[in-house]
């Protein structure tokens, strides 16, 4: 089966949703109210103008009487514009002959398709017509992902040194501003209601998790549905072939386990949208290795350079190494990219140089993993916790500094960030002999509201005494608006005496403040990690 056929199968349900929404757009309004009465509501948002402009053009809406009704209107508006943007990008790709632009458009079509799905998921979750099926915290996660997707699309052009041609295509939709308005309004409801991120039923499961999925999450032992083996002793010789079979399931609510026997698998994996509940089990991170060599200098966007790209919900990987062997001279080269909500990586090794691990979006948990890299080697805009992990800066190019994290929060209301808890930061073997000659920092602000915390972690002398770095030397970008924090760390470089003195840097002294970034609170882990068979600590 060729790549295009696989993509067509993987995206079939997404295309059906988008076509349906395109057809139904004129029917989504009801004959009540008028645009002038909405101005007061729009004035409460961060971006009143695109809000008012949208409702002037779509004047058949029902005037909201409370903020929850206004939220539904905003999400409907954002979804309408996202569908329009996806349609424009798809049409543009039909006439595009430039190889680099084709690569950027392929990413953008996928990302905007996911944005539509996240907005639709939010709408179904918060609408009174369907009955509340999610918490405000869930909605904030999905809205955060929708906004992250638009930013990832925009940045693809700069990766390949082509002019930003995607922004003009979608500019009249004002989609990013409309999603930011959704985040602000939903965020207000989240704060006002003190909505607990772990809200669920009496057994701790989120209300949107079905009974079948609850049984699935409670399974302690698993049997492989398919076996992959290089020597031909399994069902397939490649991991992607097994993933493609899983993607053809009519029902994806049951866990699909793929056992990958020891071996080096030179391939690029894609677990696409709607290919949910995949579990990859290897023979250990030293024995089951998935490796690739794509890079930005090799003609790929950062997003598409990933050796493994994970999008389907509830993905689990256990005992596997993900490598990108492009090398430090090739620039951005991702080993693992996850956009999978409620995804788990246990006892995995993620190995690369620049941009090793793209924690792109959604809620993610990494336990007892090894992560190797040089520049910005943990980056993205997920809500992610690394617990009991070992983080290993490697030897970079001459003159380069190592930066462990580059968190990508673009909106103050996004509930995203990187939390490193009870972990170890030490030099990789290739850096150790020359560790004094290379500066290493725990993070720098990729975006305006970058958020990273390091909690109860051993910090070796590999880390510079100042701890953190500006985006570039002398830059003040994000230094007042970021949130970087440390809490009860240990080790030679754990002292905060010589740390940066930015407005956005904090030394936390109260457990109550630090606990906001625990597994239980930051990613609602107590609602979906129990019963997975993966150990975790919910509090600090």
Curated annotation (Swiss-Prot):
A Gene Ontology biological process term: pectin catabolic process
Domain of life of the native organism: Eukaryota
Expression sites (tissue/organ): Expressed in siliques.
Location in or out of the cell: Secreted, Cell wall
Region of interest: Pectinesterase inhibitor 60: 32-185
Xref: CDD domains: PMEI-like_3
Gene Ontology MF term list: enzyme inhibitor activity; pectinesterase activity
Catalytic activity: [(1->4)-alpha-D-galacturonosyl methyl ester](n) + n H2O = [(1->4)-alpha-D-galacturonosyl](n) + n methanol + n H(+)
Cited InterPro entries: Invertase/methylesterase_inhib, Pectin_lyas_fold, Pectin_lyase_fold/virulence, Pectinesterase_Asp_AS, Pectinesterase_cat, Pectinesterase_inhib_dom, Pectinesterase_Tyr_AS
Uppermost EC category: hydrolase
Amino-acid biosynthesis recorded as keyword: no
Stretches the record annotates as Pectinesterase 60: 225-526
Site (Transition state stabilizer): 354
Pathway of action: Glycan metabolism; pectin degradation; 2-dehydro-3-deoxy-D-gluconate from pectin: step 1/5
Keyword Cell wall biogenesis/degradation recorded: yes
Active-site positions on this chain: 355, 376
Glycan attachment positions: 34, 91, 95, 120, 161, 195
SUPFAM superfamilies documented for this protein: Pectin lyase-like, Plant invertase/pectin methylesterase inhibitor
Annotated binding of substrate, by residue: 302, 332, 444, 446
Enzyme Commission (EC) number: 3.1.1.11
Other comments on record: The PMEI region may act as an autoinhibitory domain and prevent untimely PME activity during transport.
Family: In the N-terminal section; belongs to the PMEI family. In the C-terminal section; belongs to the pectinesterase family.
Name of the protein this chain belongs to: Probable pectinesterase/pectinesterase inhibitor 60
């Amino acid at each position: 089966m060729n790549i295009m056929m696989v993509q067509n199968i993987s995206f079939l349900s997404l295309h059906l949703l988008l076509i349906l929404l395109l057809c139904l757009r004129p029917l989504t309004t009801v004959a009540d109210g008028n645009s002038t009465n909405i101005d007061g509501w729009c004035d409460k948002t961060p971006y009143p103008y695109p809000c008012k402009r949208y409702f002037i053009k779509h004047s058949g809406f029902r005037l909201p009487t409370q903020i929850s009704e206004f939220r539904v209107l905003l999400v409907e508006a954002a979804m309408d514009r996202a569908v329009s943007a996806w349609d424009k990008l798809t049409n543009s790709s039909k006439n595009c002959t430039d190889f680099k632009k084709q690569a950027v458009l392929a990413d953008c079509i996928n990302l905007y398709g996911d944005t539509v799905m996240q907005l639709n998921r939010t709408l179904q979750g918060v609408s009174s017509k369907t009955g509340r099926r999610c918490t405000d915290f869930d909605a904030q996660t999905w809205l955060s992902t929708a906004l992250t997707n638009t930013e990832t699309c925009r940045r693809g052009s700069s990766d390949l040194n082509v002019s930003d041609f995607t922004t003009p295509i979608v500019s009249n939709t004002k989609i990013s501003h409309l999603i930011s308005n959704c985040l602000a309004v939903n965020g207000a409801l989240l704060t006002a209601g003190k909505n607990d991120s772990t809200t669920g039923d009496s057994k701790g499961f989120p209300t949107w998790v079905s009974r079948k999925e609850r049984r699935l999450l409670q399974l302690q032992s698993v049997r492989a549905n398919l076996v992959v083996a290089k020597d031909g002793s399994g069902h397939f010789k490649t991991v992607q072939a097994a993933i493609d079979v899983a993607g053809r399931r009519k029902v994806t609510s049951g866990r699909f386990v793929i056992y990958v026997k020891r071996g080096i698998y030179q391939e690029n994996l894609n677990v696409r949208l709607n290919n949910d509940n995949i579990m990859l089990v290897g023979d250990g991170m030293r024995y089951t290795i998935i490796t690739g060599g794509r890079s930005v200098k090799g003609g790929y966007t950062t997003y598409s350079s990933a050796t493994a790209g994970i999008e389907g919900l509830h993905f689990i990987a256990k005992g596997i190494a993900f490598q990108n062997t492009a090398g430090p001279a090739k620039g951005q080269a991702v080993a693992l990219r996850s956009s999978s909500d409620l995804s788990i990586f246990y006892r995995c090794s993620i190995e690369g140089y620049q941009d090793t691990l793209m924690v792109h979006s959604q809620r993610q948990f990494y336990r007892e993993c090894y992560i190797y890299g040089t520049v910005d080697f943990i980056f993205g805009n997920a809500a992610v916790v690394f617990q009991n992990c070992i983080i290993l800066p490697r030897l970079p190019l001459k003159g380069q500094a190592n930066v462990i994290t580059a968190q990508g929060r673009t909106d103050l209301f996004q509930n995203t960030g990187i939390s490193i808890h009870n972990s170890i930061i030490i030099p990789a073997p290739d850096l150790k002999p020359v560790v004094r000659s290379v500066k290493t920092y725990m993070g720098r602000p990729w975006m305006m509201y970058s958020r990273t915390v390091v909690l109860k972690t051993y910090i070796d002398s590999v880390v510079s005494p100042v701890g953190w770095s500006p985006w570039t030397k002398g830059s003040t970008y994000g230094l007042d608006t970021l949130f970087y924090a440390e809490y009860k760390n240990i080790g030679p470089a754990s002292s905060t005496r010589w740390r940066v003195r930015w407005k956005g840097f904090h030394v936390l002294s109260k457990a109550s403040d630090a606990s906001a970034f625990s597994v239980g609170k930051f990613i609602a882990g107590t609602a979906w990690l129990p019963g997975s068979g993966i150990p975790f600590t919910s509090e600090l």
